[in-house]
């Protein structure tokens, strides 16, 4: 097992190094097809490293603001990858502006802002791996995870304090937001999906909904059991109550997503066992499988409307 863990965690470290290039390549302000970007550059924190935060405003933001409109807010991780493929390391993007604009203009969601929080490059895994999952790992696997993936610096709890105690108050002060959990949701993909669910569990009074696209429950980049089992124990004990909360989960079937089905199915059952309903008009849980799709921004962009509608549809 030790050899397997070292190999797996080495792959994680290699994958994380890609995001160093991502940070270097994405310094240019994104140019969305609709709406506009405000950048809070090098937003300082007492809890984690400073980073850019890109806030997307819809095309008619100023007119809506003048009319007294208040806005839903979606907090999204990996903020470098959300708006403009020309500024990303792999020339792919979620194209969030297109989806949100279309849903707003069709009246399916109320006016909405998107807060894109940049990841922290080499510390992405440290910030996005739910810290309390570590408590449910045996000493050997926990130490290997700490050394090889988290760089002996687990930061997920600090990252959430940054979001909740520093960033959200700044956003609420700067923009006419709807501040309550019913209008404040959080989402991401892969490790970003993992930290989104963790955020709602740890701060259920802040986030009323969480979405994980291709959520990376497996921890490493090969099938394994110890890291998912730690997540299951945490979810069993700490999942946000179903009253007033919504959860969205999905995965594809190719690339890294080809590993996800058994782990996601187990998570789905835990969520149902905790009282969430995925049937009927009162459904507060949705889980989907997208055949033939992989682990990339193009795939997530193509289905972004589904979680947004589920979490914020009116």
Enumerate the predicted regions with their spans.
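Non-catalytic cap/lid and distal C-terminal segments of serine-dependent acyl enzymes
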Residues: 27-314
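Bacterial N-terminal signal peptides that target proteins for export
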Residues: 1-12
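Sec/Tat signal peptide C-region and signal peptidase I cleavage site
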Residues: 22-26
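Bacterial N-terminal signal peptides
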Residues: 10-21
């Amino acid at each position: 097992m030790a050899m397997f863990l070292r190999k797996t965690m080495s792959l994680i470290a290699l994958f994380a190094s890609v995001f160093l290039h991502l940070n270097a390549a994405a310094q240019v302000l994104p140019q969305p097809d609709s709406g506009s970007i405000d950048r809070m550059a090098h937003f300082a924190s007492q809890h984690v490293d400073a980073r850019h935060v890109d806030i997307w405003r819809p095309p008619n933001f100023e007119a809506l603001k003048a009319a007294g409109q208040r806005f839903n807010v979606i907090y999204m991780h990996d903020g470098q990858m959300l708006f403009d493929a020309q500024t990303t390391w792999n020339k792919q993007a979620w194209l969030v502006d297109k989806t949100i604009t279309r849903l707003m203009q069709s009246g399916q969601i109320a006016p909405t802002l998107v807060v894109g929080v940049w990841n922290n490059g080499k510390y992405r895994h440290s910030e996005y791996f739910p810290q309390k999952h570590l408590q449910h790992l045996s000493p050997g696997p926990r130490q290997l995870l700490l050394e090889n993936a988290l760089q002996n610096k687990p930061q997920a709890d600090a990252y959430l304090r940054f979001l909740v105690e520093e960033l959200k108050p700044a956003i609420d002060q700067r923009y006419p937001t709807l501040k309550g959990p019913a209008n404040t949701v959080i989402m991401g993909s892969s490790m970003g999906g993992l930290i989104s669910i963790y955020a709602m569990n740890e701060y259920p009074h802040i986030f009323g909904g969480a979405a994980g696209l291709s959520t990376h429950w497996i921890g490493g980049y090969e099938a394994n059991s110890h890291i998912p089992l730690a997540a299951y124990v945490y979810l069993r004990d700490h999942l946000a109550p179903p009253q007033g909360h919504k959860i969205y989960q999905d995965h594809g079937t190719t690339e890294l997503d080809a590993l996800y089905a058994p782990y996601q199915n187990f998570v789905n059952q835990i969520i149902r066992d905790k009282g969430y309903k995925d049937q009927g008009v009162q459904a507060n849980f949705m889980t989907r499988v997208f055949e033939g799709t992989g682990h990339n921004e193009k795939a997530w962009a193509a289905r972004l409307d589904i979680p947004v509608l589920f979490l914020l549809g009116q």
